Each structure stands twice: as structure tokens, then as C-alpha cells.
């Protein structure tokens, strides 16, 4: 097997999947930081963000990782990050005040592009559309409604989202239903010929639901673990060619329970049809991504799983804990990030 990157800490974990060996190469570890935001621009450039004001960047595929200070925000929790290049990135500080910052010079300077001082405000995740202009940020309920704001200029300015006047506002939820800021992946902006622009959002808590936040055309209960403060959906990814999505979650307080933690979604004429995998992931999972129409990766505090059949069966390849996994938007590199300042690269055969 080829070695694509230099191992910074000299630590590689070898795993087997379908008779083939994978490697999880730990690139960074040991800091008192929990990474939950991760954005991989290409095979060379990625950014990550997390607790205690942590922002890091690599421009050489992880050979070196630069810790970038954000003056005045050293104690903030940056739960999500969206990067556009080695120089441009947007970070989200979750709560009171909720703040979004943008850099265009590789983190030398940060500009505040959004702030909300509303009591109880808690931002959960961001997503950016393929045009790199349209963006959305979502947050927990304020006065009975999930918070959502949009940007049409690549995050330079934001305004609160309002639903179409003729449709029911699917943002209305009980106080016991919200979103999990576990990996910045509970929201997905898509644009499909069959059903136009949609904003797929998953929730948890007392109810786990899949919502179309933009068009307000569905607000469906998910056949997955729910009912408690630590249960529900955490992450969604969508594959356009197959018109399908995969949702993962479970119970982060009981992270080894391997049931009711994954839902497969097939969209028929714009409406979701749910099914469960034959073999689910092996515990609570906070993030899921498609590599292609058939291959997916999911991770959480109790391990990493891979599927090669569209999410129907999952194989545990590691019990290592990670919060988030992302693939290069342009390229093939796959990186993971999690607690204790851990950043790793997953190398597939």
C-alpha cells in the first residue's frame, strides 16, 4: 500500500475492511481542545475549529498543522468552520453572543460578519452551497422556533430566514426538540431538478425529525432513537446522483448502543421515504459523509464505520473516538477530528 502523507506523530492504526487494510494516521494530538468543525478544501488544505478558541490550518496535507489565534475569542467554542481556500474561512462561535467571523488572509485577521446577543441563542451548524456564495447557519429554538440565517455573498452579510408566507413554518418546535452541535453537519443545502432548492435539517431530543427548512414541504419523524436529551439525529449527507441521504445519530450518553442510530432516505418526487440499514453503525455516530454513491464513512465517540453498499451494512474499522470526518471537496483526502486535539487522516486502499 502507498503512503501518501508523512506521519507527524509516527502513529498509524491499521484496520481491515473487506479484506483490505486502511490506515488512520494521527497528525495532531494531546491538546486540551475538542475539535468539532472540519472543512477540507483539497488534498493539501484543511481547516479545523473547536473549543478554547481553537482554529488550525494545514496547507500541505497535514505534514504541518498551524495553530491560528483568534484574538479576543480565546475561550469561545467554534463548533463549525467552512473553508474556501488556504486564505479564506468562516468560523462559528456558538453562544451568547453568537458570532460568525471571516478571514481572507489565512487567519492573520478576522472580521465579525454576524452577531446575535439574544438570550438563549445557540448556533449549531453552517453549510455552504456549491456556488460558494449561498450559506446557511442554524441554531436552537428561540421563542419556539429554530433559528436560521442565510448569506448570499459567501458569508460577508447575513439575514434571518423567513419561510414562504403560504406555507407552515416547520421551524416551530417544542423546547425539548433542537439540534446537536456535534459536527457541524446537521444541515445540508441542495439544489435538485426534481424538487428545487432545499435545506435538509435533522433534529433530536424529544423528537428526531427530517425537515425541509427552505421549502417547508416536509417535517417528518425519523425512525431512530429519540425521546431523551441526548438522543436523536446528529448528521445528514446527501448524494445527488442517487437522490438519497443517510442520517446518523443515536444516544451520545450511551455511545455503544448499536441500534436505531441510522436512517436511509430515498427521495421520490421530492418526498423522503425512510428505511433502516440491515447492519447499522456500531454505536452513536455524530457525522456521516458520502465518498460516492455506494461508499460512506461515519464516526463518533465509540468508533468509525464504513459502508460499501449505500449505507445498508456498516463495518467497524476502528474504536478510536472522533467527532467529525470530511473528504476534500476537490480531491480524495479524508480527515477526521475530535477530542484531545486529535486530527487524523484516513487512508483507504
Segments and roles (model prediction):
Residues 22-349:
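Residue-level hotspots at or immediately adjacent to binding/recognition sites across diverse folds
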Amino acid at each position: 500500500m502507498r503512503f501518501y502523507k508523512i506521519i507527524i506523530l509516527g502513529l498509524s492504526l491499521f484496520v481491515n475492511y473487506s479484506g483490505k487494510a486502511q490506515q488512520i494516521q494521527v497528525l495532531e494530538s494531546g491538546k486540551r481542545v475538542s475539535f468539532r468543525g472540519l472543512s477540507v478544501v483539497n488534498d493539501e488544505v484543511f481547516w479545523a475549529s473547536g473549543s478554547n478558541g481553537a482554529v488550525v490550518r494545514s496547507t500541505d496535507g497535514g505534514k504541518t498543522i498551524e495553530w491560528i489565534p483568534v484574538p479576543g475569542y480565546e475561550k469561545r467554542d467554534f463548533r463549525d468552520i467552512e473553508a474556501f481556500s488556504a486564505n479564506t474561512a468562516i468560523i462559528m462561535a456558538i453562544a451568547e453572543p453568537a458570532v460568525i467571523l471571516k478571514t481572507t488572509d489565512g487567519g492573520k485577521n478576522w472580521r465579525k460578519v454576524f452577531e446575535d446577543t439574544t438570550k438563549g441563542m445557540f448556533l449549531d451548524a453552517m453549510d455552504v452551497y456549491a456556488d460558494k456564495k449561498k450559506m446557511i447557519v442554524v441554531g436552537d429554538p428561540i421563542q419556539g422556533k429554530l433559528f436560521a440565517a442565510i448569506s448570499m455573498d459567501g458569508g460577508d452579510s447575513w439575514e434571518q430566514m423567513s419561510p414562504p408566507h403560504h406555507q407552515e413554518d416547520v421551524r416551530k418546535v417544542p423546547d425539548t426538540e433542537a439540534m446537536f452541535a456535534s459536527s457541524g453537519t446537521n444541515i445540508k443545502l441542495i439544489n435538485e431538478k426534481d424538487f428545487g432548492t432545499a435545506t435538509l435539517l435533522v433534529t433530536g431530543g424529544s423528537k428526531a425529525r427530517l425537515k425541509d427548512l427552505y421549502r417547508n414541504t416536509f417535517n417528518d419523524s425519523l425512525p431512530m432513537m429519540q425521546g431523551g436529551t441526548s438522543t436523536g439525529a446528529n448528521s445528514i449527507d446527501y448524494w445527488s446522483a442517487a437522490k438519497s441521504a443517510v442520517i446518523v445519530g443515536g444516544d451520545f450518553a450511551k455511545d455503544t448502543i448499536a441500534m436505531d442510530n441510522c436512517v436511509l432516505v430515498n427521495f421520490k418526487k421530492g418526498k423522503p421515504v425512510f428505511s433502516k440499514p440491515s447492519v447499522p453503525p456500531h454505536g452513536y455516530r455524530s457525522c456521516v459523509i458520502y465518498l460516492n454513491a455506494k461508499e460512506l464513512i461515519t464516526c463518533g465517540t465509540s468508533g468509525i464505520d464504513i459502508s460499501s453498499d449505500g449505507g445498508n451494512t456498516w463495518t467497524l474499522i476502528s474504536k478510536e473516538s472522533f467527532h467529525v470526518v470530511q473528504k476534500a471537496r476537490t480531491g480524495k483526502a479524508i480527515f477526521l477530528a475530535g477530542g484531545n486535539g486529535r486530527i487524523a487522516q484516513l487512508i483507504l486502499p
